[in-house]
Amino acid sequence: MDLPKTLHDFLLVFLGSGLILGSLGVVLLTNPIFSAFSLGLTLVCISLLYILSNSHFVAASQLLIYVGAINVLIIFGVMFMNGSEYYQDFRLWTVGDGMTLMVCTSIFISLITTIPDTSWYGIIWTTRSNQIIEQDLISTSQQIGIHLSTDFFLPFELISIILLAALIGAIVVARQ
């Protein structure tokens, strides 16, 4: 968006704060419904950050897929669960939590050290070796469609099969 710098910075800080608070709510809230709603807040803040960075197609995809489908499915699944079984054996800290914290911290540190050294310009504009897409010739939506039907056809189909299996599993669980 073409916003004044002060408004852009304010929105960036506001959405970043919402993102941090929502993600802390996902992890720290003990009620699964509140945790799922915090996940929805986090995903909406991410899509608004995409809008702020002029990635409107990615923002629309984020809202439709994650907030509109995945988060609704999570809330639907949480409402079918029996809530009493989660509060019987509640421990504040376990060995698995410590191991998970160590693994996540090491992944976070490796990402923080790797991301600034990456040449993102070459990754974004180069599709195959020695082939560069001209920005003025085709729009971003057409580029995404071309990539999904050529370069990323197999991963796209594999993801659709995985989602179909998850949908069938959800139907089987709901019928029981």
UniProtKB/Swiss-Prot annotation:
Q: Where is the signal peptide?
A: none
**Catalysed reaction equations from the record:** a plastoquinone + NADH + (n+1) H(+)(in) = a plastoquinol + NAD(+) + n H(+)(out); a plastoquinone + NADPH + (n+1) H(+)(in) = a plastoquinol + NADP(+) + n H(+)(out)
Transport in keyword set: yes
UniProt KW keywords: Chloroplast, Membrane, NAD, NADP, Plastid, Plastoquinone, Quinone, Thylakoid, Translocase, Transmembrane, Transmembrane helix, Transport
Q: What is the similarity comment for this entry? A: Belongs to the complex I subunit 6 family.
Q: What function is annotated for this protein?
A: NDH shuttles electrons from NAD(P)H:plastoquinone, via FMN and iron-sulfur (Fe-S) centers, to quinones in the photosynthetic chain and possibly in a chloroplast respiratory chain. The immediate electron acceptor for the enzyme in this species is believed to be plastoquinone. Couples the redox reaction to proton translocation, and thus conserves the redox energy in a proton gradient.
Name listed for the protein in its UniProt record: NAD(P)H-quinone oxidoreductase subunit 6, chloroplastic
Query: What species is this protein from?
Result: Lotus japonicus
Gene of origin? Answer: ndhG
